[in-house]
């Protein structure tokens, strides 16, 4: 017969959510910082700028 699983405690749930939010906040901060750097023109970006594909000779 099927038995329901134990309920996850509120503390464990809140701990997981806090971790996810902390990770998301960190990634958002990095993305915002990179965007500001690119827009201000003082970036040392890792990827080369996109080249036009039709300019091959």
Swiss-Prot record:
Which GO CC terms are listed, alphabetically? Answer: large ribosomal subunit
Q: Which GO terms describe its biological process?
A: translation
Keyword presence, Plastid: no
Q: Where is the composition biased (Basic residues)?
A: 1-22
Q: Which UniProt keywords apply?
A: Ribonucleoprotein, Ribosomal protein
Annotated spans, Disordered: 1-35
- What InterPro entries does this protein's entry cite? Ribosomal_bL32, Ribosomal_bL32_plant/cyanobact, Ribosomal_zn-bd
For molecular function, the Gene Ontology terms on record are: structural constituent of ribosome
The family classification in the record reads:
Belongs to the bacterial ribosomal protein bL32 family.
PANTHER family, per database record: 50S RIBOSOMAL PROTEIN L32, CHLOROPLASTIC, LARGE RIBOSOMAL SUBUNIT PROTEIN BL32C
- What is the name of the protein in this document? Large ribosomal subunit protein bL32
Lineage of origin: Bacteria, Bacillati, Cyanobacteriota, Cyanophyceae, Synechococcales
């Amino acid at each position: 017969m099927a038995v329901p699983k134990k309920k996850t405690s509120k503390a464990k749930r809140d701990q997981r959510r806090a971790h996810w939010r902390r990770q998301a906040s960190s990634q958002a901060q990095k993305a915002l910082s990179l965007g500001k750097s690119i827009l201000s023109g003082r970036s040392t970006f890792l990827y080369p700028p996109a080249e036009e594909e039709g300019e091959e000779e």
